[in-house]
């Protein structure tokens, strides 16, 4: 018997049975308990979702921007009213501590919907005079039906981040959550419907990567926004382009550098480094997992980091005092433990953690101790590859130029940060770092107003911020001639 029973698709404003005959299970990563059996969408179900999205989108786009704004604001109110219940669901599905899901996951998703609800009325075109009797004007029109494909680390937040600009601009969205954390997107769909979003404007189809491939290749979809790993992102982008030259937004992986200079406030730097590696058990795409520390302060910095790691409270996610939970799946647990073994084998110095937590209530969950490696080299796998778990690699450097060169020596370019009291150095270093999201003397906050996205193989396009709306609209140019037409022949 599962906790939440059978979960279906959400199409045309209501829960709907899948036609594939297939299901998959989702488990509580802290206890191993079966949470739900989930129906997997078929190709026919995706077609049905696209058809209902087209119909709903026409009604949604015909509304005034102010009407759409009011409906989205009502959805925000409902999300905030139900924050605690949604946070508990997210806690069970992801394994995150309840203190975290209550304060972050739903809150930041609602903030982004509120932000774009406020911008819906600001979508406008231009008027360009050509001659006294002729001018051009432009219209920003919605793309139509968009697809969102989410990751398992921030299920409801990602669903909000992808749907908010799409809906504000007059589009419909078909959202596929990760099969690892499939539950909260259905609650968001219910909230949108209750708020007044027309049937079909936000549909949810469940399933594994094969369902994501169906969405990416579907000719009736105009844009795909994907969050996940680099290799999967490349496949999604290839399918999207080969099928119908879709617009794409890709928020992919990272191996982000955090540079601590010798003039830094070391207590602050240690606080930042621990947050940048162990928040959400290290399952954050922007984590600063390559920690470069100037040689003169390395020992003092390491001492402070280890003191803070010792204070991390791993435990039951439902305990309000817990601030460190399990990994989201058994597959991720095996992957992270494999990287830890690799770090040991390649000669990194294990300073903390380095093993699975198995005592007492940890035995049935997917917990890995917060792990810190010192004396790391740039050629180690734990330094080069994205782990997506609670593993910090500390490296030393001598000069600013050296730190920048080594920080940039990666195929990734999602995030970067510096800790220094020297304002000139801070900006100089940030301007040289090849990353799309950067922080000075802080780490990790991604407010609605801040564009989020990467350089190099960390992504294409941006989420959040004003400019994202441009990527959910297309420009129509119209020339108007008020005077006599001048024939060519």
UniProtKB/Swiss-Prot annotation:
Site feature Seems to be a necessary countercharge to the potassium cations, where: 247
Gene3D superfamilies the UniProt entry points to: Aldehyde Dehydrogenase, Chain A, domain 1 (3.40.605.10), Aldehyde Dehydrogenase, Chain A, domain 2 (3.40.309.10)
Assembly notes: Dimer of dimers.
Keyword rRNA processing appears in the UniProt entry: no
Residues bearing PTM Cysteine sulfenic acid (-SOH): 285
Name the UniProt record assigns to this protein: Betaine aldehyde dehydrogenase
Co-factor requirement: K(+)
Binding site for NAD(+): 150-152, 176-179, 229-232, 253, 285, 386
Biological function: Involved in the biosynthesis of the osmoprotectant glycine betaine. Catalyzes the irreversible oxidation of betaine aldehyde to the corresponding acid.
Cofactor note: Binds 2 potassium ions per subunit.
